[in-house]
Amino acid sequence: MKVGVLWLISFFTFTDGHGGFLGKNDGIKTKKELIVNKKKHLGPVEEYQLLLQVTYRDSKEKRDLRNFLKLLKPPLLWSHGLIRIIRAKATTDCNSLNGVLQCTCEDSYTWFPPSCLDPQNCYLHTAGALPSCECHLNNLSQSVNFCERTKIWGTFKINERFTNDLLNSSSAIYSKYANGIEIQLKKAYERIQGFESVQVTQFRNGSIVAGYEVVGSSSASELLSAIEHVAEKAKTALHKLFPLEDGSFRVFGKAQCNDIVFGFGSKDDEYTLPCSSGYRGNITAKCESSGWQVIRETCVLSLLEELNKNFSMIVGNATEAAVSSFVQNLSVIIRQNPSTTVGNLASVVSILSNISSLSLASHFRVSNSTMEDVISIADNILNSASVTNWTVLLREEKYASSRLLETLENISTLVPPTALPLNFSRKFIDWKGIPVNKSQLKRGYSYQIKMCPQNTSIPIRGRVLIGSDQFQRSLPETIISMASLTLGNILPVSKNGNAQVNGPVISTVIQNYSINEVFLFFSKIESNLSQPHCVFWDFSHLQWNDAGCHLVNETQDIVTCQCTHLTSFSILMSPFVPSTIFPVVKWITYVGLGISIGSLILCLIIEALFWKQIKKSQTSHTRRICMVNIALSLLIADVWFIVGATVDTTVNPSGVCTAAVFFTHFFYLSLFFWMLMLGILLAYRIILVFHHMAQHLMMAVGFCLGYGCPLIISVITIAVTQPSNTYKRKDVCWLNWSNGSKPLLAFVVPALAIVAVNFVVVLLVLTKLWRPTVGERLSRDDKATIIRVGKSLLILTPLLGLTWGFGIGTIVDSQNLAWHVIFALLNAFQGFFILCFGILLDSKLRQLLFNKLSALSSWKQTEKQNSSDLSAKPKFSKPFNPLQNKGHYAFSHTGDSSDNIMLTQFVSNE
């Protein structure tokens, strides 16, 4: 028969005089220190609580132990000094059988959830008469919590200035406040049945928030009720010493949170502490159902903070050597002080980001030793133990992890080919860089990693494979790859659904090159998860994106993905196009662009054919100039868009992508500014009836507005953002949106502002036309022109406005499929809309075109008839007669009025 082991946990309280054998031992908890009469003792008397674990074999030995505790009576004299046991109690009774430990509380002691032995590995049973704590012995941690006396907690606020000395229990000011509070509360509570002691446990900031703990032998409900009954007495006693804040005094019987750092607290309490020595900042915790949870933390190593300040001193005259030395100093500090506090994480990410931006702007190169220092720094802050602190940081800086990833990629691109190959394999990050040579033409590129997650020996593998067919053009200089398991835990996951990153995050950077197909292989971290999605981190929208990536194969442990380069018209406002509708959007884009370009060319041909017939009044001439430039601007913009769509979206050695962005931006702006010129013309001819601006002056205004303003905006945009590499997106050839400067606003704001202005102009003009002021009468020709302008503007402006309005929708709600389809549809067919509503809507142009086509048709028919008549008659059957056309007259009339015609008639008087 196997006998279980039993324990009786006993609680002793000693007082030790000067020179006592207990001394100052860290293993013994000092409860409080009192100054006593020096005549009786040579020094202060200290009170200790001693917790003893005593083993017994059966119930008889247990009874003997209980009786022994009862026989212990003060004072006891020891040879090392005067020791007095003031109380001795059994607290917890435990028995162990077959590896399972079960404990119950002794008389007047109880469990204080979640203090049941080891809260993580034990379960508190409350259904029985005596609540018991049950757990497996092999799971217990080194420190466990046993049954305690009944405790009641209380807090109140003192209207005095808080000082950091109140956080130090050894300081004089702490002792002053604590001793005064304990004396007054003890007087108020000493007559309560079961009351044993009261002790100040903490002071918090917020005036001075004092927390105290009352210990008693009665039940929690009885002790709490008694303390509440004498609450007024306690407040009056405290008010004699301190100015209390009204309504701040409260007591509660259950501490939701209680630990050695933040003390006790009830639900939703917040407690702020200064950081420990050597750090600057504060740490704030909130009491939640699971205990104290850190919600804010700014603890930055003092050395790091100083280093961050020193960085600004080298920016003005920075050199590669200075930057390299700075990174080396940062690496040394991190290596000597590896603590990954939230403040340290934020500070390191900020420093690395600043180094990256400075190096990119100054075109610095990064040596192999500097790159090794960067990877060592990254390995430290990507420690899997720091994930909890990353979670806290991401509450304040949501995209700090994205910023880190982008920074590491940018710094990696600064390593010259001559410093490669390099390979840094650390515990939490792997980095590899190679120079590209002609062997890539034959064998392609492969990058493989093997990393072990925390608390497991099973490796997680990953692989990047680029086929040799992707290197058939001029070769890139370098290929950089890196991988990390921790990044998958800290990069934000979309709020939609409960997805999680289930593999390593792998990054491959090929500068100045275009890759159209890449295969990726991932080991699953958790093989039981299903329905994998192949995604990439979208730096433009700061989220996971599946555009251009799809699942190739899935086994129980391995997922294979394929990613390709995709471009659609929808990138003008949003680079994210859901993969489910991408073929539709792409088809709409290119078919629509073909029709649009053809329509615009037709617009220009029609204008060229009938330019002289239409050019009569100043208003008509100016309108034609505007329409021609609108068509021309959109035509060139569409061509440049196609150029941008055919080059690599990330880089191009000749700068074609940057040029495409600039000219697309410029000519799309020109389109809108020429529309604004149309609006101004319309308002001018209606409102200022008797004012006539000179033709050359009106043209000067038109061309300055139509091309001058767009040129200024475009040049300023590229001049401000290109040096910091924030001008264009990394994934598509278009203006950037994700960075702080947001150069895309340099297009969106003017375009939408012009659309809004033109709507207002149309409304004003329509009102003026319906109710003209007395004396304001236009000529018939000018009024017809104005009506034509109004029709064109009224239809053309809403179409263009809606187009870019739906584009804004693709940014705000990138997951909405309707935004992308409508946006692509309206944008792709803009040229066709201009042909219909800007050219064919004009009745004069329509009539001229009809006449031209009719004349051509009649001429062909006449030629055919004459040819038929000649073939029916014999040769020379009629003598030559120079007057054979007598009686036949050809009438042709051309005019400049609205009823212009070109008509050919044949009549006979015979």
Swiss-Prot record:
GO terms for molecular function: G protein-coupled receptor activity. Residues 610-621, 685-696, 768-784, 843-910 are cytoplasmic. InterPro entries: Adhesion_GPCR, GAIN_B, GAIN_dom_sf, GPCR_2-like_7TM, GPCR_2_Ig-hepta-like_rcpt, GPCR_2_secretin-like, GPS, SEA_dom. The chain crosses the membrane at residues 584-609, 622-646, 659-684, 697-719, 743-767, 785-813, 817-842. Glycans are attached at residues 139, 168, 205, 282, 310, 317, 329, 354, 368, 389, 410, 423, 437, 455, 512, 528, 553, 736, 739. Autoproteolytically processed at the GPS region of the GAIN-B domain; this cleavage modulates receptor activity. Glycosylated. Glycosylation at Asn-389 is required for secretion or folding. Mainly expressed in the kidney. Up-regulated in lung adenocarcinomas and prostate cancers. One of its GO terms (cellular component) is plasma membrane. Disulfide bonds join 257-287, 275-299, 534-561, 549-563, 657-733. Changing residue 830 to A: Strongly decreased G protein-coupled receptor signaling. Changing residue 570 to A: Strongly decreased G protein-coupled receptor signaling. Residues 1-19 form the signal peptide. It is a multi-pass membrane protein. Keywords: Cell membrane, Disulfide bond, G-protein coupled receptor, Glycoprotein, Membrane, Receptor, Secreted, Signal, Transducer, Transmembrane, Transmembrane helix. Changing residue 683 to G: Strongly decreased G protein-coupled receptor signaling. Residues 534-579 are annotated as: GPS. Changing residue 761 to A: Strongly decreased G protein-coupled receptor signaling. Residues 437-579 form the GAIN-B domain. Forms a heterodimer of 2 chains generated by proteolytic processing that remain associated through non-covalent interactions mediated by the GAIN-B domain. In the inactivated receptor, the Stachel sequence (also named stalk) is embedded in the GAIN-B domain, where it adopts a beta-strand conformation. On activation, the Stachel moves into the 7 transmembrane region and adopts a twisted hook-shaped configuration that forms contacts within the receptor, leading to coupling of a G-alpha protein, which activates signaling. Changing residue 573 to A: Strongly decreased G protein-coupled receptor signaling. Changing residue 831 to A: Strongly decreased G protein-coupled receptor signaling. Belongs to the G-protein coupled receptor 2 family. Adhesion G-protein coupled receptor (ADGR) subfamily. Adhesion G-protein coupled receptor (aGPCR) for N-docosahexaenoylethanolamine (synaptamide), an omega-3 fatty acid lipid highly enriched in the brain. Ligand binding causes a conformation change that triggers signaling via guanine nucleotide-binding proteins (G proteins) and modulates the activity of downstream effectors, such as adenylate cyclase. ADGRF1 is coupled to G(s) G proteins and mediates activation of adenylate cyclase activity. Also able to couple to G(q), G(i) and G(12)/G(13) G proteins; additional evidence is however required to confirm this result in vivo. PANTHER family: ADHESION G-PROTEIN COUPLED RECEPTOR F1 (PTHR45813:SF3), IG-LIKE DOMAIN-CONTAINING PROTEIN (PTHR45813). This is Adhesion G-protein coupled receptor F1. It comes from Homo sapiens (Human).
